[in-house]
């Protein structure tokens, strides 16, 4: 099938009729129609609470990272220490992280957090201190109250699906999450029992009144 990716196109409105989304509208007033809609807005998913009449309890959790330049194949394996880790890349870089902070949508890296990351990483591999740091940055993780993502049909809507709230495991769980959601939408046998991920959890004492 033909697939078109439309970048830099923030969506601002669901057009809901009789429990079904007929279309969505972007900030530039463009209207998009589809048979099924999937919410994959990560840390920003709570934005849809009012429109969908649901309290979506997904919050941003900041994580900071540091990137080293090392020789290729210098570090042969991933290392972990408490909540910190070292991940070698094929191009000779080593990713070091990561922190956790509840500071809203702030993505400003700080010197203090950098030092905390470095201390933990040098404890694992002291030799890493000999190599240059090429980058420090901060991102946002979508945290759910239990750490379990929401994957499946949204409550009270016939054609809206959730795939958000993966917290620290978005990249790791992404392919399996997409596969599971595809199976649910197409009513195919699922690779695992989807009950634990079901968005019906959003209706448990959290519906707005």
Q: Which residues does each PLM region occupy?
A:
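General small-molecule cofactor/ligand-binding pocket signal
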Residues: 4-6, 134
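A conserved short coil-to-beta-strand element within the FAD-binding core of flavoproteins
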Residues: 7-22
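Active-site substrate-recognition segment that forms the wall
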Residues: 31-32, 36-158
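Short, conserved active-site loop motifs that form the nucleotide-linked donor/cofactor pocket
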Residues: 3-4, 160
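Short, hydrophobic/aromatic-rich segments at coil-to-beta transitions
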Residues: 19-24, 74-76
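Glycine-centered tight beta-turn/hairpin loop motif at sheet-sheet or coil-to-beta transitions
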Residues: 27-29
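C-terminal catalytic lobe of FAD-dependent flavoproteins
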Residues: 125-209
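General beta-strand recognition
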Residues: 23-25, 95, 161-162
């Amino acid at each position: 099938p033909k697939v078109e990716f439309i970048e830099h196109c923030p969506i601002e409105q669901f057009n809901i009729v009789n429990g079904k989304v007929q279309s969505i509208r972007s900030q530039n007033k463009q209207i998009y129609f589809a048979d099924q809609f999937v919410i994959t807005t990560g840390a920003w998913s709570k934005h849809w609470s009012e429109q969908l009449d649901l309290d979506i309890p997904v919050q941003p959790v900041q994580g900071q990272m540091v990137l080293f330049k090392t020789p290729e194949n210098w570090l042969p394996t991933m290392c972990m220490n408490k909540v910190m880790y070292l991940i070698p890349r094929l191009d000779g870089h080593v990713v070091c992280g990561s922190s956790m902070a509840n500071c809203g949508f702030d993505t400003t890296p700080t010197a203090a957090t950098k030092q905390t990351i470095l201390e933990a990483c040098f404890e694992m591999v002291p030799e890493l201190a000999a190599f240059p740091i090429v980058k420090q940055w901060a991102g946002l993780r979508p945290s759910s109250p239990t750490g379990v993502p929401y994957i499946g049909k949204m409550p009270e809507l016939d054609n809206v699906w959730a795939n958000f709230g993966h917290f620290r495991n978005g990249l790791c769980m992404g392919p399996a999450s997409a596969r599971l959601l595809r199976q649910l939408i197409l009513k195919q046998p699922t690779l695992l029992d989807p009950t634990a991920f079901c968005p019906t959890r959003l209706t448990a004492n959290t519906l707005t009144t």
